């Protein structure tokens, strides 16, 4: 069982891009040529953090940002963190253990500490219920009356 568990000692990263795509199937073989795939690999490498990053030229529809406020951070598919739109790596079932696991992996692999610290900062931001919406989008949604900002009331 240890060998199986050791195979899951990783963080996932990737990228969402758009571009031309072509494929050819020949029996059991598949040949793919894709601008989007090449761009995704380059973007993933350049960002260098454990996240699935959405390319800057992909416009995320407002409904995803609005959903963050309607259903909460665990239910929204996309987050904005440190100037990047990313696929939300968290859900209700695995949120808490994701932070614990990242901390364990960081202790086991200190040479990758910066990547784990990035992930743990994202984990903390979600736990603190930060907006995690691009500032310009948040301002526009508020100014258009789509969402309303209300200051947090002190607990009594």
Identify the residue ranges that each predicted region occupies:
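Intrinsically disordered, glycine/charged-rich C-terminal tails and inter-domain linkers
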Residues: 49-50, 54-156
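Short, surface-exposed, charged loop/turn segments at secondary-structure junctions
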Residues: 28-39, 64-73
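Catalytic core of nucleotidyl cyclases, primarily class III adenylyl/guanylyl cyclases
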Residues: 3-35
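Short glycine-/polar-rich loops that comprise or flank the Walker A/P-loop
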Residues: 10-12, 47-50
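Amphipathic alpha-helical regulatory segments at dimerization interfaces
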Residues: 3-4, 42-46
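Generic structural hydrophobic/aromatic packing signal, biased to beta-strands
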Residues: 16, 43, 52-54
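Glycine-rich loops and low-complexity Gly/Arg-rich segments
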Residues: 37-42, 78
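Residues that flank catalytic or metal-binding motifs in active/ligand-binding sites
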Residues: 17, 39, 48
């Amino acid at each position: 069982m240890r060998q199986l568990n050791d195979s899951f000692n990783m963080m996932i990263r990737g990228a969402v891009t758009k571009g031309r795509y072509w494929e050819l199937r020949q029996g059991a073989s598949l040949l793919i040529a894709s601008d989007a795939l090449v761009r995704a690999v380059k973007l993933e490498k350049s960002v260098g953090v454990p996240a699935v990053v959405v390319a800057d030229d992909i416009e995320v529809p407002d409904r995803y940002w609005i959903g963050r406020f309607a259903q909460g951070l665990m239910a929204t598919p996309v987050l904005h963190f440190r100037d990047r739109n990313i696929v939300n790596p968290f859900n209700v079932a695995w949120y808490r253990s994701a932070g614990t696991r990242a901390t364990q992996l960081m202790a086991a692999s200190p040479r990758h500490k910066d990547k784990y610290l990035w992930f743990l900062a994202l984990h903390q931001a979600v736990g603190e219920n930060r907006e995690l919406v691009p500032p310009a989008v948040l301002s526009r949604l508020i100014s258009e009356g789509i969402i309303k900002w209300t200051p947090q009331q002190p607990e009594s």
